[in-house]
Amino acid sequence: MPKLPAVGIDLGTTYSCVGVFQHGKVEIIANDQGNRTTPSYVAFTESERLIGDAAKNQVAMNPNNTIFDAKRLIGRRFDDATVQSDMKHWPFEVFAENGKPRIRVEYKGERKSFYPEEVSSMVLTKMRETAEAYLGGTVTDAVVTVPAYFNDSQRQATKDAGAIAGLNVLRIINEPTAAAIAYGLDKQGTSERNVLIFDLGGGTFDVSVLTIEDGIFEVKATAGDTHLGGEDFDNRLVNHFVQEFQRKHKKDLGQNKRALRRLRTACERAKRTLSSSTQASIEIDSLFEGVDFYTSVTRARFEELNGDLFRGTMEPVAKALRDAKMDKGQIHDIVLVGGSTRIPKVQRLLQDFFNGKELNKSINPDEAVAYGAAVQAAILHGDKSEAVQDLLLLDVTPLSLGIETAGGVMTTLIKRNTTIPTKQTQIFTTYADNQPGVLIQVFEGERAMTRDNNSLGKFELSAIPPAPRGVPQVEVTFDIDANGILNVTALEKSTGKENRITITNDKGRLSKEDIERMVNDAEAYRQADEQQRDRINAKNQLESYCFQLRSTLDDEHLSSRFSPADRETIQQRSSETIAWLDANQLAERQEFEHKQQELERICSPIITRLYQGAGMAPPPTAGGSNPGATGGSGPTIEEVD
């Protein structure tokens, strides 16, 4: 079997997308529902696990056990302020385990809990299966995207999610950079262009300034907010309508998860409508305690409710330009990416910021990131086609990285917006006489004191020979790989003693054992999903066979040929089986198959006799073969005498 190409996956907060570069062009792959983007939702029910459209479609009926927004949890600690505020909006339960958030749901009557990485891995698995259905084989290699402003922990956790999904993650790349590839791929050979990518999605916001020339994409600066997007605009609308409902009907629906979910779905739809119309209506029958909720919202009201959030998107734009040492006039193209850039007010603010300059809407904002990721996947997989062979990506690290020195001071080794991969070394020493060891504490952030920055991890370099303060020399090396993930090494020069850390468990990273366990769990869930599919198939075949028998009884050409006894037998047996089906919807596959065998053993000879007497060929059964043997798409069943 030929080696399948690597795919590019945009793992989004609200929607995900997968693309593949083949025959010199990118194909964005539609899922089994025909949609080119798939909701990043996973649901658990009494009988099955659902991922994507199927999960989102049943969310109002099953809010407690439908997980979304895993990207807002991944790589964060439970006590993170954003996690605490998000929990107020989520209908599912989030609890702390070793300082990390876990999500608890009920599946097949049992309580199960998942780390955000596991939930994201389920979405990645769905994207992988979407690609496999299109490519006709097993996909193992992928490039996965993250917001440019994701920190080290979030990147590492995303890579772990890929591993749990059974993917070999070739590279983690930044979303705006991927979008820039989608924008600039067909512009090779043109003179140098400065491009600003404005990427406002469902849950995250990034701004990147790049220079594109002759296939070289060089990121100059990046800025953003890993917790701002369409979901936040929905939240404002939901809160607004909860208050309106309280005012009008004197009822507080704030604690009713199902009502809130139905309201949120309506708000999301209204928000989209307001991008093309100036008014949207909301009509929800029996929203809460039997009260119908009919109302409307104008675009002006929506803009007022979210005014501070919309205006807040301009600060990262200014910051990225400052860091890139460019002024507004030097930007040639302003490219919009992410579904939330369809909001007219956001476009107006951005255009005003650039003194009326036209915005570039030439790329599909929902698909651009997966498109660029697919191109990068092809390059890393060794694709030699002309379109990509000269393409080079130079990205940057979004946050400054350093260590804590005496007095809790942040000493930066790698400044933000440094091109990656990169390596920096600095010599440190002891601050006390005969100090036996040093504690290397690693932080990321821009503040002067480490307490105000984000701790990534720490490790000890011990057994330093006794010496006066200032004499021992400890060489600390920071090494950032192409994924933006950090390795730190400390070396004591006189003894050659070395210690290193790929920032791991201190910052809530999953251990190797955790990941292996989750890979096994993922396989178990996949098998359970498959068994469920087989079960449904067997049930449908049995149901279909029963109704086929009934339609034969009603067939005007055949009904007169039945003897009363045969008619009675078929009528009785098919009715009994349908009644059994209604009462045993959750029976096992084998039970459905056994029932069908029993029914066929009695009814097939009657039907065959009837058709032979009429000189006609017997009809195909539910499975697609003659009565008396099932087959086709379902499980094969051998007739037993």
Swiss-Prot record:
One of its GO terms (cellular component) is cytosol. Keywords: ATP-binding, Nucleotide-binding, Phosphoprotein, Stress response. GO terms for molecular function: ATP binding; ATP hydrolysis activity; ATP-dependent protein folding chaperone; heat shock protein binding; protein folding chaperone. Belongs to the heat shock protein 70 family. GO terms for biological process: chaperone cofactor-dependent protein refolding; protein folding; protein refolding. Pfam families: HSP70. It comes from Drosophila melanogaster (Fruit fly). InterPro entries: ATPase_NBD, Heat_shock_70_CS, HSP70_C_sf, HSP70_peptide-bd_sf, Hsp_70_fam. Disulfide bonds: none annotated. It comes from the Eukaryota. Residues 612-641 are annotated as: Disordered. CDD domains: ASKHA_NBD_HSP70_HSPA1. NCBIfam families: PRK00290.1 (NF001413). This is Heat shock 70 kDa protein cognate 1. The gene is Hsc70-1. Residues 625-634 have a biased composition (Gly residues). The modification Phosphoserine is found at residue 362.
